């Protein structure tokens, strides 16, 4: 601690910062965002933003729902936490490698390769969820290792994509406003992974078919009160929505899933992801890699404050 305090004090009083360029020192907040607005009008920047907005649709169901389905099928939350713990050192190692791979003429290649891997892993995740042992069977060691391996590989591909695209942002960002430039692109990238999630969750509910089954000996009056009829042999309504689950729980019933919308939704997402990759994202990325770094910037002329 003493050495840290000494070093910090030395930096505070004796270290001098490198002189700023006149363009950086004279640009205020208004000027920076004025430049950013002009940058957003560049055709290749608009294409990059468009790619960010659609790129994560393909594996959105896998990211948002697979973990929930594994827990729903009997995997303990502590087991998922173990997967995260195992995954952490791999993220550090492969994140560094991804940054190394993202240099040169084909800076987006690691991002594209990881894109394909995530689509494949989304299909693998569906197979893992489908093959989960049904209660009262327990999850065996081999199957548990398979789940952990799939989780680590998914996280690895996600890390490669994140680091790869961040490295590309670093290459194209204007050094004068690099922080603002990269914040804008990273915000758009995060938004691309956020906006589809609502629709994915709604699709899972929409495609799911389930019914409530009354327990043996349930009171006729209770059925009449909750469901409007007293015949326990008839379907007691859907059991997918929160309201349906609540009605079923009021009589002590059980929800039976006839068709899980997770598989339909994830399949639709993978098909959309593969189609957009082949016909939209890949051609755009190839063209963006050919854009020279100066073309991602705009002239600072006109943003300097007037001097008297």
Located regions from the model:
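A membrane-interface helix-boundary motif in multi-pass transporters
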Residues: 1, 109, 202-275
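C-terminal membrane-cytosol helix-exit motif in multi-pass small-molecule transporters
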Residues: 3-20, 277-284
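Loop-to-transmembrane helix entry/capping segments in MFS-fold secondary transporters
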Residues: 77-78, 144-145, 175-186
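Loop-to-transmembrane helix entry
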Residues: 46-49, 66-90, 111, 145-146, ...
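Helix-to-loop junctions at the C-terminal end of transmembrane segments
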Residues: 91-113, 204
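Pair of pore-lining "gating" transmembrane helices in MFS-fold secondary transporters
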Residues: 40-65, 152, 156
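C-terminal ends and interior cores of transmembrane alpha-helices
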Residues: 116-140
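Juxtamembrane intracellular "pre-TM" segments in multi-pass secondary transporters
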Residues: 17-47, 298-308
